[in-house]
């Protein structure tokens, strides 16, 4: 009986010490996590800026924008003329009853 009581007492003390150690363990601080996140973002930004500075990437971007401009210019002109026609239709519609 004494052996059983001693065993239970020993197990209880060990589990309490384990809980105490867990409570005393340093948890990761929110500030350090945020700081680490911003440091990672800053590093990625620096890497991206180095990649953007390469002349071949700049030439590729320039050709892409020129190609896009060539394709979009006729569409924008067409949309502009259709908008003017649409608005002039309503202007004419509004002036017709006044003249009759």
UniProtKB/Swiss-Prot annotation:
**Region called O-glycosylated at one site, residue ranges:** 32-43
Q: Which residues carry this modification: Phosphoserine?
A: 54, 68
What InterPro entries would the database entry show?
Answer: ApoA-II (IPR006801), ApoA-II_sf (IPR036172)
Grouped into one coarse class, the protein's main location is secreted
Signal peptide: which range, if any? 1-18
Subcellular localization, as worded in the UniProt entry: Secreted
Function field: May stabilize HDL (high density lipoprotein) structure by its association with lipids, and affect the HDL metabolism.
Q: What is the protein name given in its UniProt record? A: Apolipoprotein A-II
Species name:
Homo sapiens
Query: Could you read off the lineage of the organism from its UniProt record?
Result: Eukaryota, Metazoa, Chordata, Craniata, Vertebrata
